[in-house]
């Protein structure tokens, strides 16, 4: 359970204390994070590395907020619990309560640029403005700034995102003779950045690897990692 530090052209994977020889390597990190955090094989095409470094991380510039309540009062008051806002700080809000209303929660997303000492007050004021006084007094207000997370925020967080790079054809073609696979949600052609995109990428990758296994029984001479 260690972060990968280096992957060689021969598909030897180095962590802090160990090394593994693999038949296949799957990069499940967002491409920009992989390029930033891992010394990748030197033989990778320069264009692929450039595209990977510029591909946005879906949550890399986001703040997630969850407001918890004793009951989903907005339902009994005739509100859907869903809202969009250009004023903010939350650009979108959704009802995250269970089917029976427990736990009773609203959640939303804001841009990381909104993070400052007074963001909690700003959020409470927005909830009051949109759903009434009870919304502005949650039992608990949870705020997660993903832009400060090492394995979520890429170095390019904050610049104009190039969403057109999601699902780029380079990601769908395994490199190093079909043995190095890009498999994060950002590599999907549909629903990139979402769970559905991650499932698409996983299906594409597993099909590529299992197809190779059908014609080869080779196992790793060092560790059995495939």
Give the positions of each predicted feature.
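Conserved flavin/dinucleotide-binding core of flavoenzymes
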Residues: 10-12, 61, 77-226
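A conserved short coil-to-beta-strand element within the FAD-binding core of flavoproteins
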Residues: 1-12
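Central helical "cap/lid" subdomain
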Residues: 15-79
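Active-site environment of divalent metal-dependent phosphoester hydrolases
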Residues: 6, 36, 190
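Residue-level marker for beta-strand->alpha-helix junctions and adjacent short loops that shape enzyme
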Residues: 5, 32-33, 148
């Amino acid at each position: 359970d260690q972060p990968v530090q280096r992957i060689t052209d021969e598909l030897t994977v180095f962590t802090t204390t160990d090394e593994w020889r693999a038949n296949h390597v799957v990069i499940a990190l967002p491409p920009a994070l992989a390029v930033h955090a891992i010394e990748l094989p030197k033989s990778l095409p320069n264009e692929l590395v450039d595209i990977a470094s510029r591909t946005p991380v879906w949550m890399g510039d986001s703040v997630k907020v969850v407001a918890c309540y004793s009951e989903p009062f907005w339902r009994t008051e005739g509100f859907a619990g869903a809202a969009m806002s250009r004023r903010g700080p939350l650009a979108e809000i959704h009802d995250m309560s269970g089917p029976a209303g427990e736990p009773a929660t609203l959640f939303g997303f804001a841009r990381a640029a909104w993070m400052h000492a007074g963001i909690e007050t700003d959020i409470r004021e927005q909830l009051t403005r949109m759903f009434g006084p009870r919304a502005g007094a949650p039992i608990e207000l949870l705020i997660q700034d993903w832009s400060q997370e090492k394995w979520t925020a890429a170095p390019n967080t904050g610049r104009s995102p190039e969403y057109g790079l999601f699902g780029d054809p380079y990601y769908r073609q395994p490199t190093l003779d079909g043995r190095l696979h890009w498999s994060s949600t950002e590599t999907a052609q549909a629903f990139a950045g979402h769970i559905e995109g991650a499932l698409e990428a996983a299906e594409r990758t597993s099909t590529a690897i299992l197809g190779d296994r059908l014609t080869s029984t080779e196992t790793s001479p060092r560790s059995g990692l495939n």
